[in-house]
Structures are given as C-alpha cells and as structure tokens.
Amino acid sequence: VVDAIIIIPNDRLLSTIDKDTSARNAFAICDNILKEAVEGISDLITMPGIINIDFADIRAVMQDAGAALMGIGLGQGDKRAEDAARAAISSPLLEISINGAKGVLFSIAGGDDLTMFEIQDAAKVITESVDPNARIIFGTVHDDKLKKGEVKITVIASSFPENVQKKVTSLFQNRELVEDEDKGKN
C-alpha cells in the first residue's frame, strides 16, 4: 500500500528533446531530468532551509493522496521567481495540470539575493493554480549549487479531485497494459 505515487511518463520525457537528438544524448537528458526530480524531493528534507520542510510536511501532503505530480522550474532575470514557478507547474514531468490539487508542497531555492517579494511572487503563481482551499506547505533554502542569480522551485501537488485522480490512474493503467502486451510479444 502506498500513500501517493508520482508518475513520470517516458513520453513526457521525450517531449523535452529535439527530433535530431541522438539516442545516447536523449537518454542522458532524460536521466538528468529524473535525477533532478529525485534530488528535488530529497533536497526538500535534507537541505537546511531558511524556512524548513521536513518529512512530516511531505507526509501531510502525500498521505492517502493517490496520484501526485511533481515539477521543477528554474528562473533567471527580473521575474526569475515567477518564471521558475511557472516552469515548475508546467514541467515536462507533469502529466496533467496541477489545477484542483488540494495538497501542495513547494520549495524555493536561491542565493543570498533571494528576496521576500520574490518568494511571495512565486507562491502567488503556485497558489493561484491550485484549489483555493488547498493545504499548502512551502520552504525556502539557500542553494550554493545554483548559478548566480538563479532560482529553482520544486513543486509536489497531490489530493486531486476524483475526476483528475481517475484520469491519472487510467493513464498509468493504460501504460501498464501496453507494457504487458509488449512483454507478451517477446
């Protein structure tokens, strides 16, 4: 039994590459996206923060949540926090929109120059995209791995309305059926 499952479909990963990308480079790009996803989740609880997120926060958002979605976004320039938030909620890792999510956890990572207004702007982009009564938990961390002037936002959205849960579940089950049929042919 699981509380939540994050689905990262291969065909969505393929949408991040050009047609001319070699298979070797395509797998490297896809591997990097998956690595960032895993790092994004582990960084939420292991990286000391200005505003900390801990395992209890993740449990609060993920427990009995069903399907969950995850996105990561990077931003630079004048609107870097808003751009990172928009990129995270429209990430190639997201099978469907985060609209309607009733559980949201997000982390804003930046350097010493990250401002409270940027945190507020990013939070506004994310909170306006989910259920108005959603349980929202966020944290902020200082990340030395980021380039100067860069902001990184990791979003996990869960507890979707039943119609969205069914859509995500059916997408996952359809993939399993295709994979099972392919295995039977070998």
Regions found by a protein language model. Give the residues of each.
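Tubulin/FtsZ superfamily GTPase core signature
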Residues: 1-186
